[in-house]
């Protein structure tokens, strides 16, 4: 990228610059994947929540995903549509407010479901309830960030599910990826089906979470489309949902900062910026 200093001359504090053309390019690709595959693709606020760009997003997608009450409010009040909401744990004092801002609400455990789903449905009778499941497989390399590592706090493993799900549970939510390719999704899907397909006839939808970095250069978009189409052919009654975050904002502009000092030690010169070193 060639930087024109004059472009940033009036910026005095660290600033992310969003390039609308680049953003729309990502949105166009994501919209294409959704149309061709038949999946619903929604925006994850965990990775992207620049609410002033929501009018642009509404030209391409219809919903968002939240992980807290404030994120659910952001989607409901600023994006203009109820959210798909998941949290590792909901507070009793917030569950009704979360439900009123949501179209889908996913519980992390059966105990949370049992304790709170009645209150959630009382607050919003149109709510679709889901359960996060853990296929015990993920190719995320760093254990700290692996949602399916042994002892993970995320989701219910197959051995803990009853043969017949509670009637209020309409969907499963899986999140196993981080900036992953379509090949990783394909391999992960084998494990998801192996562990959980016997419950699929009882469901209406399945959410394959985020981490699908489909806007990255070299990503096999056609392969992703074919994977989803193949899954939908095997389970035509299931609505498929993906909720990437980084894919929407991927390489849509620079972070502008300033060098405020240069230090040297043992021949190594280091520029000190007015942004985090990491």
Predicted regions located by residue number:
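Generic N-terminal amphipathic, Lys/Arg-enriched alpha-helix
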Residues: 1-18
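N-terminal glycine-rich anion-binding loops that anchor highly charged ligand groups
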Residues: 3, 25-29, 35, 40-48
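Short, flexible, solvent-exposed loop/turn segments with mixed acidic/basic and small polar residues
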Residues: 4, 32-33, 92-96
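A short small-residue
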Residues: 7-11, 170-175, 209-210
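Generic structural "secondary-structure junction" signal
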Residues: 13, 18-19, 147, 156-158, ...
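Active-site anion-handling motifs in enzyme catalytic cores
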Residues: 22
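Active-site-proximal beta-alpha core segment in soluble small-molecule metabolic enzymes
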Residues: 39-205, 227-230, 234
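C-terminal active-site-proximal or functional interface alpha/beta core segments in diverse enzymes
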Residues: 180-278
């Amino acid at each position: 990228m060639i930087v024109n200093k004059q472009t940033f001359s009036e910026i005095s504090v660290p600033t992310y610059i969003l390039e609308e053309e680049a953003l729309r390019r990502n949105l166009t690709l994501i919209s294409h994947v959704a149309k061709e595959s038949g999946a619903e693709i929604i925006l994850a606020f965990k990775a992207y929540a620049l609410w002033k760009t929501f009018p642009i997003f509404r030209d391409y997608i219809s919903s968002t995903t939240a992980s807290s009450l404030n994120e659910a409010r952001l989607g409901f009040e600023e994006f203009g549509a109820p959210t798909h909401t998941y949290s590792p744990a909901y507070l009793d004092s917030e569950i009704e407010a979360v439900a009123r801002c949501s179209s889908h609400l996913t519980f992390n455990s059966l105990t949370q479901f049992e304790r709170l789903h009645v209150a959630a449905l009382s607050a919003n009778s149109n709510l679709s309830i889901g359960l996060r499941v853990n296929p015990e497989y993920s190719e995320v390399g760093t254990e700290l960030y692996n949602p399916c590592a042994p002892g993970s706090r995320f989701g219910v493993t197959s051995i803990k599910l009853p043969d017949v799900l509670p009637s209020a549970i309409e969907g499963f939510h899986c999140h196993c990826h981080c900036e992953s390719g379509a090949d990783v999704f394909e391999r992960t899907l084998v494990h998801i089906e192996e562990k959980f397909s016997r419950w699929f006839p009882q469901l209406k939808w399945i959410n394959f979470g985020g981490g699908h970095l489909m806007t990255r250069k070299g990503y096999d978009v056609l392969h992703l489309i074919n994977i989803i189409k193949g899954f939908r052919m095997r389970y035509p009654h299931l609505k498929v949902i993906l909720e990437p975050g980084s894919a929407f904002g991927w390489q849509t502009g620079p972070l502008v900062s300033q060098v405020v000092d240069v230090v040297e030690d043992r021949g190594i010169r280091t520029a000190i910026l007015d942004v985090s070193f990491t």
